[in-house]
Regions:
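Structural detector of well-ordered beta-strand residues that form the stable sheet scaffold
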Residues: 13-15, 36, 150, 185
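Active-site C-terminal subdomain of aminotransferase-like
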Residues: 44-49, 54-124, 130
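PLP-dependent enzyme catalytic core of the Aspartate aminotransferase-like
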Residues: 168-169, 176-233
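Conserved PLP-binding catalytic core of the aspartate aminotransferase-like
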Residues: 126-130, 137-180
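Short loop segments at secondary-structure junctions
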Residues: 40, 55-60, 166-169
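Phosphate/diphosphate-binding loops
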Residues: 18, 37-49
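Catalytic PLP-binding core of fold-type I/II PLP enzymes
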Residues: 1-34
């Protein structure tokens, strides 16, 4: 994508929120112009934790469209100059002071990720998502369950989560799953998204998710939940 974009004189950036922390990245090697990502998914920062921004060094001299005092040249931030001088790196796109509590959580998580190694994390992630896909196929792929997989079967095209699809009652089934302590989400029109985290989830927990889904259908437990969607699903 980057190569084709540059061949047509197009700047290209990527949202890496669903890949950072579970997939290796080499943004410099790929010559990506910019990228951004949150830290509350696989980086385990929690709600409100800091966002991150990558800027290719060839764009360090660009003037940020939205400037803030924290993007000023770091060694002169407190000079209170009238003229804005952007830091000549990704820091030039910072706007204000980062939240310290959110940063603290991310710092601890990054230390664990570094110790584990992103290649090892990716290897376990592929095994976990493949295991989940195989279980859904074997246990839930027939009537009356009627679940299917929406994610790519080829792991090289798959990220860290698996989209489990069901034409009917996917939302209420996801709510029944949450009631059993499974953190999942629903995406219209028919997707239940499961995202095992290699750092702390286990294969046994994946097995439990699939058999929770089986029991939810066997016992019609989803009927205990409203069809009206919450604002956050």
């Amino acid at each position: 994508l980057t190569k084709k974009a540059h061949e047509n004189d197009i700047k290209i950036g990527f949202d890496c929120s669903h890949s950072v922390g579970v997939i290796p990245h080499n943004l410099d090697k790929w010559d990506v112009d910019f990228a951004m990502w949150c830290s509350y998914k696989y980086l385990n920062g929690g709600p409100g934790s800091s966002a991150f921004l990558y800027i290719n060094e060839k764009h360090f001299n660009k003037e940020p469209g939205l400037a803030g005092w924290f993007g000023y040249i770091k060694e002169k931030q407190f000079d209170l100059s009238i003229d804005f001088q952007s830091a000549q790196n990704a820091g030039g796109w910072q706007i204000s002071s980062p939240g310290i509590l959110g940063c603290a959580a991310v710092e601890g998580s990054l230390e664990i990720i570094k110790e584990a190694g992103i290649e090892n994390i990716r290897e376990k992630s592929v095994k976990m998502t493949s295991y989940l896909i195989n279980l859904v196929d074997e246990v839930l792929g027939r009537k009356p369950y009627n679940f299917s997989i929406g994610s790519p079967r080829d792991s090289s095209f798959r990220g860290g989560h698996v989209a489990i699809e069901r034409e009917e009652e996917a939302y209420r089934i996801s709510e029944a799953l949450k009631k059993k302590g499974v953190i999942c989400d629903f995406r219209p029109p028919n997707v239940i998204r499961i995202a095992p985290s290699p750092l702390f989830n286990t294969f046994y927990e994946i097995w439990k998710v699939v058999f929770h889904l089986k029991r939810i259908i066997d016992n019609s437990e989803y009927k205990n939940f409203s069809k009206d969607r919450d604002e956050v699903s």
